[in-house]
Design a protein with these regions (language model features):
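Transmembrane alpha-helices of multi-pass inner-membrane enzymes
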Residues: 10-14, 35, 249-254, 271, ...
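Long extracytoplasmic/lumenal interhelical loops at the membrane interface
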Residues: 294-312, 323-370
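Alpha-helical transmembrane segments of multi-pass inner-membrane proteins
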Residues: 1-3, 7, 75-80, 103-111, ...
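Hydrophobic transmembrane alpha-helices and their immediate junctions
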Residues: 97, 207, 254, 258, ...
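A conserved mid-to-late transmembrane alpha helix and its immediate loop/hinge
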Residues: 233-236, 242, 347-389
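A membrane-periplasm/extracellular boundary helix in multi-pass inner-membrane enzymes
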Residues: 165-170, 237-240, 253-304, 312-319, ...
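Interfacial loop-to-transmembrane-helix boundary motif in multi-pass membrane proteins
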Residues: 27-35, 89-104, 136-162, 217
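Loop-to-helix entry and N-terminal half of a specific, functionally important transmembrane alpha helix
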Residues: 36, 221-231, 357, 361, ...
Length: 484
């Protein structure tokens, strides 16, 4: 098929899926464009790459001015939205004190970074991840916001990835070892697998909800749209061939489905047992059985020696085991050069070593940049996030299962990938799940079904620009976490 014809069909297909998935009873804020654009940028390619703009100077240190400007504008607008929603924002920030402490420590760690200016700029971008999670969680209809936002991201990125892979060179590339890989709208196969993972979990959750709840409005056409999107996701998992992401999706899907079984959801102890079994199974699989995929991604033979060589070489390189090298600073410090020379001495492929800038383990990555203090803070976030998601599960098993899936897959994914880094979809969706779960547990959102009448939809965006106290005098606060 001619690529131009395929592009036209793809565009029409995306428009058709958006039309089928529309919900007339849901009127989310226009502010959702902010996290939508943010996630598309971090989940696909930098804006500078789409525009064909080459960064000036040292890309590792300076980055792209175009990308910095885009992220800065989105962050500034998001902060403005959160200020307008100050009551809900304050409640969520206080409820998520482990995340606040972690970000404050990251800010302090900028002071001992080898490049404090670069580290501080990266911390500002990291704040953007949290700000986007708060924009979603403070929406009038937060669950509907998650459904709509993630679905639209999938409608845009999934078909376009297939188009790029099948009909254009944009979706195919070669790794540093000369092996072909499918990248779709992203820069490498692991990035493609990751964005497919975080989107497909919500899509699967949507499909299950539509299958179970037969009274949903426009159920048939929405089920067709979500089912098609899920099929695209499964196809892209196969094309990307990222075993870590496939394993996380299987485990996350199993958690969503199994935890909603009557025999499990009525027994809290069984939910704990299910989560523990999944976590242990994933850990043993990735550490003992999944080494072939990780080694292949690193250009090594499928043996455990590849990963252990990386870890054994990089861990002693940390300048201070307690506080680390400084926020996002290890890979721009002299320790990186020492680490590269050590890998070369071990016989690693030089072009691969040259571009090596992560430990392929999220926990070790945090240790390198933030030391044991950072690792403990990440562990605190995961534990508190699990507890909050479990409390939501007791109130609403359907919603709680999604939050549990994101917390679980976030912890599992970081066993073999740097999943706790800024501008990483795994980290962003982990924040969304934890912040949203905190909103439920804090009683910030009502539990009944909430629909915005059509007569109010035209005023919704005007109200969004008003101070929160004034808006509450105009209409009752909305947004039920149990309502769709």
């Amino acid at each position: 098929m001619n690529p131009s014809v395929a592009s036209l069909i793809c565009a029409c297909g995306i428009a058709g899926l958006l039309y089928l998935d529309r919900e007339k009873t849901v009127h989310s804020s226009r502010a959702l464009w902010l996290p939508g654009i943010w996630i598309v940028m971090v989940g696909s390619r930098p804006l500078s790459q789409w525009l064909g703009v080459s960064p000036a100077g040292n890309e590792q240190l300076d980055g792209s001015p175009v990308d910095a400007a885009a992220f800065g504008v989105l962050l500034a607008i998001a902060i403005g939205v959160l200020i307008r929603r100050k009551s809900r924002t304050r409640t969520l920030l206080l409820a998520n004190w482990p995340i606040l402490i972690c970000f404050l420590y990251f800010l302090v760690s900028v002071t001992w970074s080898y490049h404090p200016d670069v580290s501080f700029k990266r911390w500002i971008k990291a704040i953007g991840d949290l700000a986007m999670a708060l924009v979603i969680a403070t929406d009038r209809q937060p669950v509907a916001a998650i459904r709509r936002l993630v679905s639209r991201i999938g409608f845009l990125l999934f078909p376009t990835s297939v188009l790029f892979i099948k009909y254009y060179d944009l979706g195919r590339a070669f790794d540093d070892d000369g092996m072909p890989m499918n990248t779709g709208v992203t820069t490498n196969k692991n990035a493609l697998g990751l964005i497919v993972l975080v989107v497909s979990l919500v899509v699967l959750w949507n499909v299950r909800s539509l299958l179970i709840n037969k009274n949903e409005p426009n159920r048939g056409r929405r089920l067709l749209a979500q089912g098609t999107l899920l099929a695209f996701g499964l196809w892209l998992f196969w094309l990307a061939n990222s075993s870590t992401c496939k394993a996380c999706f299987i485990l996350g899907s199993f958690l969503i489905i199994a935890s909603n079984l009557r025999a499990i959801r009525r027994r809290p102890a069984r939910v704990h047992a299910l989560c523990l079994i999944i976590l242990l199974a994933a850990g043993f699989t990735l550490l003992l059985g999944g080494q072939a995929d990780v080694a292949q991604a690193l250009g090594r033979a499928p043996s455990m020696s590849g990963r252990t060589e990386i870890w054994a070489s990089v861990i002693p390189m940390v300048p201070n085991s307690i506080v680390g090298a400084g926020f996002e600073s290890f890979w721009i410090s002299p320790s990186m050069e020492i680490f590269h020379r050590k890998l070369l001495d071990l016989g690693w492929y030089p072009p691969l070593v040259k571009h090596f800038n992560e430990a392929h383990n999220g926990y070790i990555e945090v240790y390198l940049n933030s030391g044991w203090i950072g690792v403990c803070l990440i562990a605190l976030i995961l534990i508190s996030g699990y507890r909050r998601a479990l409390k939501v599960f007791h109130r609403d098993p359907e919603l709680g299962s999604l939050f549990l899936a994101y917390v679980g897959t976030g912890a599992i994914y970081s066993i073999t990938e740097a999943g706790f880094r800024m501008l990483n979809p795994s980290w962003i969706f982990l924040l969304i799940a934890i912040v949203s779960a905190s909103g439920v547990n804090a009683g910030l959102f009502g539990g009944g079904k909430h629909e915005v009448p059509a007569s109010r939809s035209r005023r919704a965006d005007f109200h969004e620009l008003m101070p929160e106290r004034e808006r509450e005098t105009v209409h009752a606060p909305g947004g039920g976490f149990n309502a769709i």
